[in-house]
């Protein structure tokens, strides 16, 4: 059982994991080469000991969640931990599962922040210019302000399982990964997010989405919403399109705008008529689901090699 810890300098020591102990005192004044430090689930109290870590200019990843199992102590301890940051470092902080309701100070100094499984109802990241990755899954979020300005560098946002009705990421042109599944979103606009590669908005209340042309998008998940139609946007590199469990009545809009799609799931919609000629515009298609629709007629007049499509067709109600 470790209760007191003195970290002496070692020329090759870069990673230390000390999670799940009973450490109450830390002396780390000589850890000048340390890059990764895990202190999760210990009994550390908010003292000045942690300030000694500022001498480690290489430190980039600190885990301190579960400190002392006391929200107030965690907040105070966090105030000390934030002094570790050096402006040139890329630093990750994990504060998940602490039942926090108020934003800790100093978060704007970090490049990667994990705040999953807390109790935030609002989060303000307006001045988080250094932020690259933000995870706020399983909170109680009703609103959020994203970073603003010319130097915004955020690429990864995950906000699944919250209570969001509206979000505005249209000015976050740097985002490549955005996931806000299991919220209450009714409308999303992200025309300016030109570098998006992964977009998951499933399990919301979406009736419309304005995405614009997305040359980099690889996966688009709009399943389990209330969409009746989709805009005729261009997704030339899209690999996976999930639009199942909506209210779509037609599928004609896909055609050449989805020429590289390999997986298309349009099950559980309101489709009544299918012209399989649209498959000629999807030369890469490998998986097509049209089951549980209201299809009464399938037009195969202009579709070659219909035999290869039979396993796909018979999944639907004909």
UniProtKB/Swiss-Prot annotation:
It comes from the Bacteria. Keywords: Leucine-rich repeat, Repeat. LRR repeats lie at residues 109-129, 130-151, 153-173, 174-194, 195-216, 217-237, 238-258, 260-280, 284-305. Transmembrane segments: none annotated. It holds the Pfam family LRR_1. PROSITE patterns: LRR. Missing about 125 C-terminal residues compared to orthologs. This is Leucine-rich repeat domain-containing protein YddK.
